[in-house]
Amino acid sequence: MPIDQQLLELLPQLMRFRTVDISAAAAALRLNPRTMQRKLKALGTSFEALRDATRKTLAQEYLVETSIPLARIAHSLGYSDLAVFHRSCTRWFDQTPAKFREQSRRSRPLVMSPSH
């Protein structure tokens, strides 16, 4: 499996528990960080791009599927500052995390549980 696909599978697992840098990701794949960088560059991507894509996916999941406070989501995705998370969400979704959460919830169909 190409290294970029391996990372896309690994990063969500690692990021749910801690902030992940290139050294931690490389160690999990038993690679030297520089070797991983070279392999990713050969595929036309970077660790930073894959981590950003993973953060976007996890942010979307947390914002839509949970009521976790924004500061906690930001921290769990490795942001030390809520303002940086806000900027990332605006870049990804063209709106703030609160607006994205609100709009996503309004547009989701209500699922009714069967009555007993």
Regions found by a protein language model. Give the residues of each.
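Extended mid-to-C-terminal alpha-helical interaction segments
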Residues: 1-111, 116
